[in-house]
Regions:
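Secretory targeting and sorting signals
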Residues: 1-32, 59, 196
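Short linear, low-complexity motifs centered on an aromatic residue
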Residues: 26, 340-342, 389-394
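Gly/Pro-rich cap/lid or specificity-loop segments adjacent to the active site
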Residues: 32-318, 370-501
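A general alpha-helix detector
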Residues: 265-266, 318-323, 335-338
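Amphipathic alpha-helical segments that form the core helices of the histone-fold
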Residues: 297, 323-325
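Structural motif
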Residues: 305-321, 328-332, 358-366
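Short helix-capping/linker segments at secondary-structure and domain boundaries
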Residues: 327-341, 345, 378-383
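Long, low-complexity segments enriched in small/aliphatic residues
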Residues: 344-376, 380
Length: 501
């Protein structure tokens, strides 16, 4: 998928403390003296699957931008240079989803295809945000049972019970406050944006172009708000609502509607006659698929199935999370169908998806939690208010069973220093948005809110497609052409448009 469902708490979408220069009105930053841009010592990347053309380096950035000469963190950065220097027009930064996505790995996965698609028009660059991958990390020292994805996603217990969710959320917040240190408090969208501009300086570029996906669209939007004159051609692929009141918590809540929008695509696939040939047909008619999955999850709530992973059964919430992940891309439909079949067959032993079979690394869990909790103040709501929200969401959206509105560690987090950035139409008209009509993580409704906020700065291409993350992934030829043409020629549709093919 184009974001990272096994490594990210929201869209992966999440947030952290916004520092002083990002105000509630998000005016462009006032220039002030900064340390000289560091030199990047490029070398061949050594991580698995890195293409021969991919180079890596390390970039020092301030822990605290109010103390730029103080303690420094290290970011892993990467590039794939244009193979056509005569046609190169600039540098394009690939902004990963998340929070929790690795820019370096994203460039490994997409770099060769992107370089071919853009015909060498750009040097392609990316970095691991602070807290991610080979960059400086932090840990909350969480117990393994608190680091499973079905724990971090705060799925309610059977019948919507949230007592354990409340206890776990408080436990995680206290552990992060105790063990995370100043590094963890620095894991914010605002600092990722500052780090990206520091990377621009180190590259010697006056401007950057960008392709941001999922949570990366929010990072991209904040950068374009803070540094509007340093943006060239800006692509936001699969956006959420940027309203400061909706950041993080609202993104997660929207996943209930997103799953409902996307499920018909899976249901049609799972009941197509072609599934008879590969033995994966789940029902006779598409309308039978949702009740089948909901009832199977309820059965697994009562009677979890032993799996091929010792000590980790398939629970109802495990099935629900596996479905949520599968809805990101059509390619994941078949593995989920096999899981459903095995869960129904008393003679079979279900095989858990790898993202559910083991605890997430402590460093990844810390990043996932901290960014969403640091960026914005979450309501310190009562247990009763969360129970009401979960009950209402479970009734309306049985596939997600109340998880998207449930309590998270953010309810027990320290109060952030600043308000999040407000995205506005103040800036150059150089943004192209790409949005799926049936996105399980960033529903079209949220993308339309981003479009409204950007005003004449943006044009929106809505793709008649399901899945999350479109360009060179889950999209269609029409949407891909629109992005490629914009990045290579600067031409955008004159007005918002739909892409049916």
């Amino acid at each position: 998928m184009t974001t990272y469902p096994h490594k990210a708490l929201l869209l992966a979408l999440a947030t952290a403390t916004v520092a002083a220069s990002l105000t509630a009105t998000a005016a462009p930053a006032v220039a002030r003296p900064a340390p000289a841009a560091p030199q990047l010592d490029w070398h061949r990347c050594t991580h698995p699957d890195a293409p021969a053309a991919q180079e890596c380096a390390e970039l020092p950035v301030p822990l605290d931008y109010d103390d730029p000469d103080g303690r420094q963190l290290t970011l892993a950065v990467s590039r794939i240079r244009s193979d056509r220097p005569g046609t190169r027009r600039g540098t394009l930064v690939v902004i990963p989803g998340g929070p929790g996505g690795s820019g370096v790995q994203r460039l490994t996965q997409k770099g060769d295809a992107l370089r071919r698609e853009l015909a060498g028009a750009y040097d392609l660059v990316a970095f691991d945000p602070r807290g991610v991958g080979a960059s400086t990390t932090a840990s909350c020292d969480l117990a393994p049972e608190d680091r499973y994805l079905t724990s971090l996603r705060s799925w309610p217990g059977p019948n919507g019970e949230i007592t354990e969710n409340i206890a776990r959320s408080r436990r995680i917040a206290e552990a992060c406050a105790r063990s995370g240190g100043p590094e963890l408090r620095s894991f914010t969208t605002a600092n990722q944006v500052r780090d990206m501009d520091r990377f621009r300086e180190a590259l010697g570029e006056q401007k950057l172009s960008a392709w941001g996906t999922s949570y990366g669209t929010y990072v991209g939007a904040v950068y374009a708000q803070k540094y509007p004159r340093r943006t060239d051609r800006w692509v936001l692929d699969s956006s959420g609502d940027p309203d400061p009141k909706r950041v993080a918590r609202g993104w997660l809540a929207n996943m209930s509607q997103g799953a409902a929008d996307r499920l018909p695509d899976f249901a049609a696939w799972a009941t197509h006659p072609d599934r008879d040939r590969d033995g994966l047909r789940l029902a006779a008619a598409a309308q039978e698929v949702e009740p089948l999955v909901v009832s199977l999850a309820a059965r697994l709530d009562r009677e979890p199935r032993t799996t091929t992973t010792p000590g980790v059964p398939l629970t109802g919430n495990g099935l629900r999370q596996a479905l949520q992940n599968a809805l990101y891309a059509d390619a994941a439909f078949a593995p989920f169908a096999r899981l459903v079949q095995a869960a129904q067959d008393p003679a079979a032993t279900p095989v858990l998806p790898k993202e559910l079979a083991a605890p997430i690394r402590n460093e990844d869990a810390a990043l996932m939690v901290s960014v969403i909790c640091n960026d914005v103040a979450w309501p310190d709501a009562s247990a009763a208010s969360y129970r009401r929200a979960v009950d209402a969401d479970r009734a309306r959206y049985p596939l997600t069973a109340g998880m998207p509105v449930n309590v998270l560690p953010c309810a027990f987090w320290q109060t952030p220093v600043q308000k999040p950035t407000r995205i506005t139409d103040d800036g150059p008209s150089n943004i192209l948005m790409l949005q799926s009509r049936r996105d399980p993580a960033t529903p079209l409704s949220g993308g339309l809110k981003m479009r409204e906020a950007l005003g004449d700065r943006a044009r929106l291409v809505t793709v008649e497609q399901g899945g999350h993350g479109l360009y060179l992934g889950n999209g269609n030829a029409c949407g891909d052409r629109a992005v490629t043409e914009f990045l290579t020629s600067g031409r955008r549709p004159a007005r918002d448009t739909d892409c049916a093919n």
